[in-house]
């Protein structure tokens, strides 16, 4: 299963796969059970990928793939601040 996921990720996030390290945790913006936006952080808390942007579809965006065992909630303001930080650092 992990090998399958590893082969799918490059198709979903072509701009990030060669440039970023592994994702330790995700922040997901959900519309019901469907992923709307996602931000992936490394183990230091740095943003290593986010979607959707450009050719990067993401892992959870537009799919009913959001994990059923979500942990803590965050405010929309916290998510938006992280999203803006990701956009500010976005380089193609």
Describe the role of every protein-language-model region.
Residues 29-59:
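Compositionally biased, intrinsically disordered low-complexity regions enriched for acidic
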Residues 5-6, 13, 34, 69, ...:
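Generic low-complexity, intrinsically disordered sequence content enriched
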Residues 1-5, 28, 35, 71-73:
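Generic preference for hydrophobic/aromatic residues in regular secondary structure cores
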Residues 24, 30, 79-83:
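Broad hydrophobic/π-residue packing in well-ordered secondary structure
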Residues 14-16, 25-27, 45, 60, ...:
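Residue-level detector of functional hotspots within protein domains
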Residues 51-92:
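Short, compact, well-ordered microdomains
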Residues 1-25:
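Negatively charged, low-complexity tracts enriched in Asp/Glu with abundant Ser/Thr
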